[in-house]
């Protein structure tokens, strides 16, 4: 028999998440504390984090919020203001336990007057050798009447001991030689410097976009998780020409959250250099998967992005968003 307990605050569950089957920093309530208190008022965005216990042992956790829309309708969202949400399970979770956890969630949300539940779990590779257990979740959600609303195609490189130059496309090898010719140098920095953020901001502005996080947001995340955020930089003649900001979301998974460069220096191939720099660092630091992020806009493929990431021997994983009407 499993029981559900509600947490109306973002407490630190780092120990449980770090030892779980599939948890990431994105699902850790502590991570969500980087948001300023007034950004999401509790009256409209009520914290509803669910803990599930079996014989006083924490077996599952679901982070989320009940969002009250202008119409008065209530929607439960997991994640809320984060990249991934969904359930975090202890490593020995069984099918019947997942079934009960989902059933308890739905019953509780109905009591709260919630009309819809939105869940976006992590990729199956976040469960490593037991990632297939995510199929238990998908099956039970669909058994309860949930639908897949959107799907994103994420490209992920599985790290091995094989020489990187043998795994990447021949054109990438040529471009990397180009980087050597122009004396491109690299640096791996813990945290995010102002110069790196300024280049990120200007790079995204070229596409009419702004970064998801402000510089202050990233500094706060670095304070909360000082050993989880890295910037991979490339330089030409001492000038910063490109970078990748990576989140170490698990001990063995690196998520390349931001990829950016200076358009006027693209002839030096900073992105090629930085992708290779990230994969080399991953090999040397016990990383098993490098998540290069989405390469689609829902069901619209971003072909150049897919082709580019394929050249770095990236494989496809699906990021699914489920909706269950209550």
Functional labels for PLM-detected ranges:
Residues 67-86:
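Conserved acyl-donor/pantetheine-binding loop and adjacent beta-alpha core of acyl/acetyltransferases
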Residues 115-117, 288:
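Short acidic/polar active-site loop segments enriched in Thr and Asp
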Residues 99-104, 220, 224, 228-326:
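Aromatic (often tryptophan-rich) hydrophobic motifs at membrane interfaces
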Residues 119-132, 292-303:
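Conserved beta-strand-loop-alpha-helix junction that forms the acyl-donor binding cleft
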Residues 80-84, 150, 317:
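Short, solvent-exposed loop/turn segments at the edges of secondary structure
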Residues 2-72, 123-149, 154-265:
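A conserved beta-strand-loop-helix scaffold within acyl/acetyltransferase catalytic domains
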Residues 84-94:
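The substrate-binding groove and active-site-proximal loops of carbohydrate-active enzymes
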């Amino acid at each position: 028999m499993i029981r559900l307990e509600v947490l109306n605050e973002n407490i630190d569950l780092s120990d449980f998440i770090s030892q779980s089957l599939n948890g990431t920093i994105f699902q850790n309530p502590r991570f969500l504390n980087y948001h300023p208190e007034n950004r999401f008022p509790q009256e409209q965005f009520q914290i509803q984090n669910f803990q599930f216990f079996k014989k006083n042992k924490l077996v599952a956790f679901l982070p989320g919020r009940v969002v009250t829309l202008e119409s008065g309708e209530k929607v439960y969202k997991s994640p809320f203001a984060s990249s991934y949400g969904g359930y975090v399970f202890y490593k020995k979770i069984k099918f019947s336990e997942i079934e009960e956890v989902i059933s308890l969630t739905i019953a509780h949300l109905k009591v709260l007057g919630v009309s819809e539940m939105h869940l976006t779990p992590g990729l199956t590779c976040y469960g490593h050798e037991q990632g297939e257990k995510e199929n238990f979740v998908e099956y039970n959600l669909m058994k309860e009447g949930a639908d897949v609303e959107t799907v994103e195609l994420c490209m992920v490189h599985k790290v091995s001991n094989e020489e990187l130059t043998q795994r990447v496309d021949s054109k990438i090898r040529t471009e990397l030689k180009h980087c050597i010719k122009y004396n491109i140098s690299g640096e791996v920095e813990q945290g995010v410097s102002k110069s790196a953020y300024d280049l990120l901001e200007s790079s995204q502005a070229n596409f009419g976009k702004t970064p998801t996080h402000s510089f202050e947001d990233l500094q706060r995340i670095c304070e909360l998780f000082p050993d989880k955020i890295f910037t991979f930089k490339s330089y030409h003649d001492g000038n910063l020409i490109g970078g990748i900001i990576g989140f170490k979301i698990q001990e063995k998974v690196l998520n390349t959250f931001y990829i950016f460069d200076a358009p006027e220096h693209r002839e030096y191939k900073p992105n090629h250099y930085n992708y290779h720099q990230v994969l080399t660092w991953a090999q040397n630091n016990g990383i098993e998967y490098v998540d290069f992020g989405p390469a689609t806009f829902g069901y619209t493929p971003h072909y150049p992005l897919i082709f580019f990431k394929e050249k770095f021997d990236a494989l496809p994983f699906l990021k699914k968003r489920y909706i269950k009407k209550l």
